[in-house]
Swiss-Prot record:
The active site is at C388. One of its GO terms (molecular function) is RNA binding. This is 23S rRNA (uracil(1939)-C(5))-methyltransferase RlmD. Belongs to the class I-like SAM-binding methyltransferase superfamily. RNA M5U methyltransferase family. RlmD subfamily. [4Fe-4S] cluster binds at C66, C72, C75, C154. S-adenosyl-L-methionine binds at Q263, F292, N297, E313, N341, D362. It comes from Dechloromonas aromatica (strain RCB). It is an enzyme of class 2 (transferase). GO terms for biological process: rRNA base methylation. Its EC number is 2.1.1.190. The keyword DNA damage does not apply.
Length: 432
């Protein structure tokens, strides 16, 4: 059995060792450990391997909290002490910036982190009927598999949501559409918890009674979605608490639907918004752009400063709700929202929006390379970039520095998803 010394973690939280110049990626191994491993896939330049035995453990190794860890794909790092996870993600960010973009920030910001358990306020859970038993499986997919993990509880979900996993199995198994249920979305707000069920066929009266009884027993709200995301509607109860989240520091509340993108981790999102605003430093006299603005998670806090803000987003539905949130929070006079496909941005289309003193960019995983390449002679003097993919951040940062003349002032990791390999980050760029 081959033995290796683990050097570091890759972007999927696999340990990396080397044998005769070839990289070996070992599931479950931690930096500094000496391990036995067994390769299950061999390529000319690398191998993928399973961990067989830890000969010399890392001081960061801990016993996983969850009995499903190692099978369930919802987490990848429970065997690593939480502060060590954050440090590893900071290193992944630094490595990505250098190896992909060939750039380094002048300063590394301290990472943003929060509670490691019960943080996941939004989740899409897979559902499948088990033909032999007639029961249902509900949970995340197994590690690198299309199968659904047989989980009875989940430590990264809020406790009251984890407690719904088994009752949901019983509910879905009893529905006439049980065979055709593929997933259920969970969205936790300040005042209520919503479950969203995609239905391809109409519910029977008996199905509707079962859903209503489940709601009454478990204090949740059920949404149904017969077709695309815009068809989702609140099924039961028709009234009651709204699904919303708050940014108390800015006196803001955002209503949303289970189909809307919102940050998974409410506590870390509050810290992230606070840091983004501190780094952006909006002033009442400034005109600021919030690109990929979504519901206005950053737009409305910027508007609280008195600056004039333009929020740009590709989804007309999100822009509509952003306008509603601005009005509900008394900020309609400070905010303008517009619909634009920022993945097809040109210098001409960006210039048509007018001159901006500063810009905040919060793109999806694909990044914002078209947008940053479109920045012309009236470039914003400061850009704060919130990223959910270190690779595309590194690519876009290289464009800003080498092609657009920005200084790469600072960057730091954001641990939005504890116990996973997912790395979010925030970066600041300034013109000299």
């Amino acid at each position: 059995m081959p033995i290796g010394k683990i050097e570091s973690l890759d972007h999927e939280a696999r340990g990396i060792t080397r044998q005769e110049g070839k990289a070996i990626f070992v599931d479950g191994a931690l930096p500094g450990e000496t391990v036995e491993y067994a390769s299950f896939r061999r390529k000319s330049k690398f191998e993928l391997a399973h961990l067989v035995h830890v000969i010399k453990p890392s001081t960061a190794r801990v016993e996983p909290c969850c009995p499903h860890f190692g099978v369930c794909g919802g987490c990848a790092m429970q065997h690593m002490e939480p502060s060590a996870q954050v440090a590893a993600k900071q290193r992944v960010l630094e490595d990505s910036l250098w190896h992909i973009g060939r750039i380094r920030p002048e300063t590394m910001l301290p990472p943003i982190q929060g509670e490691p358990w019960g943080y996941r306020h939004r989740a899409r859970l897979a559902v499948r009927r088990v033909s032999k038993s007639g029961g249902m499986l509900i949970g995340f997919h197994e590690w690198r598999s299309s199968y659904i993990a047989d989980i009875r509880s989940c430590a990264i979900l809020p406790p009251h949501v984890s407690a719904l996993l088994m009752p949901m199995r019983e509910l879905f198994a009893a529905l006439s559409i049980a065979e055709r249920i593929r997933e259920v979305d969970v969205a936790v707000g300040e005042h209520c918890t919503a479950l969203l069920l995609r239905i391809l066929d109409p519910l029977t009266p008996a199905d509707e009674r079962l859903l209503c009884d489940f709601v009454d027993r478990n204090d949740v709200v059920f949404y149904l979605q017969p077709k695309g995301p815009d068809t989702a509607f609140r099924f039961y109860p028709s009234g009651g608490p709204r699904l919303s989240y708050t940014l108390p520091e800015f006196g803001l509340e955002f209503d949303f639907k289970p189909t809307d993108f919102t940050q998974v981790n409410h506590a870390v999102n509050r810290v992230l918004v606070r840091r983004a605003l501190r780094l952006l430093d909006p002033q009442p006299s400034e005109r600021i752009a919030d690109m990929f603005c979504g519901l206005g998670n950053f737009t409305l806090p910027i508007a609280r400063s008195g600056a004039t803000v333009i929020g740009v987003e590709g989804s007309a539905a999100l822009v509509r709700r952003g306008r509603e949130s601005a009005a509900a929070n008394g900020l309609a006079d400070h905010v303008e929202f517009g619909v634009a496909n920022l993945f097809e941005c040109t210098e001409q289309s960006l210039a048509a929006l007018g001159r901006f003193d500063k810009m905040l960019i919060d793109p999806p995983r694909e990044g914002a390379v078209e947008l940053v390449r479109a920045i012309g002679k009236d470039a914003p003097k400061r850009i704060v970039y919130v990223s959910c993919n270190p690779g595309t951040l590194a690519r876009d940062a290289a464009v800003l520095v080498t092609e657009k003349g920005y200084r790469f002032v600072s960057a730091g990791a954001v641990n939005m998803f504890p116990h996973t390999a997912h790395v979010e980050s925030i970066a600041v760029f300034e013109l000299p």
